[in-house]
Amino acid sequence: MAKKSAVNRNLAVKALVKQYASKRVALKAIANDESLPLEERFEARLKLAKLPRSSSAVRIRNRCEVTGRPRAYYRKLKMSRIALRELGSSGQIPGLVKSSW
């Protein structure tokens, strides 16, 4: 199990990203629009830099829904390889069968 504080921190980052998403998209559009004057684009970049660092989507870490483990994460299943193996072995994931040859 991952530390509760790490899992909660990641949840807080997700909330911040959701809160500032529209503002961030609008500022990025202004900053990247080459038809606008340079000063206006620069102001948009400054405003973007003043937003909280954790409001950027790259700060979100994919974590296992079962254990909170941050590594070896399968996106489709939203869980780590270890949780997948345990749940798969106990037959709790439909359609997952242990391979044998």
Swiss-Prot record:
Q: Which GO terms describe its cellular component?
A: cytoplasm; small ribosomal subunit
Which terms in the Gene Ontology molecular function aspect does this entry carry?
rRNA binding; structural constituent of ribosome
Q: Would I find Oxidoreductase among this entry's keywords?
A: no
Q: Which UniProt keywords apply?
A: Ribonucleoprotein, Ribosomal protein, RNA-binding, rRNA-binding
> Per its UniProt record, what InterPro entries does this chain match?
Ribosomal_uS14, Ribosomal_uS14_bac/plastid, Ribosomal_uS14_CS
Keyword hit for Ribosomal protein: yes
GO biological process assignments: translation
Output the SUPFAM superfamilies linked to this UniProt entry: Glucocorticoid receptor-like (DNA-binding domain)
Q: Which domain of life is it from?
A: Bacteria
Q: What is this protein's function per UniProt?
A: Binds 16S rRNA, required for the assembly of 30S particles and may also be responsible for determining the conformation of the 16S rRNA at the A site.
Which NCBIfam families does the UniProt record give? PRK08881.1 (NF006477)
- Similarity comment text for this entry: Belongs to the universal ribosomal protein uS14 family.
- Tell me the protein's name: Small ribosomal subunit protein uS14
Q: In which organism is this protein found? A: Caulobacter sp. (strain K31)
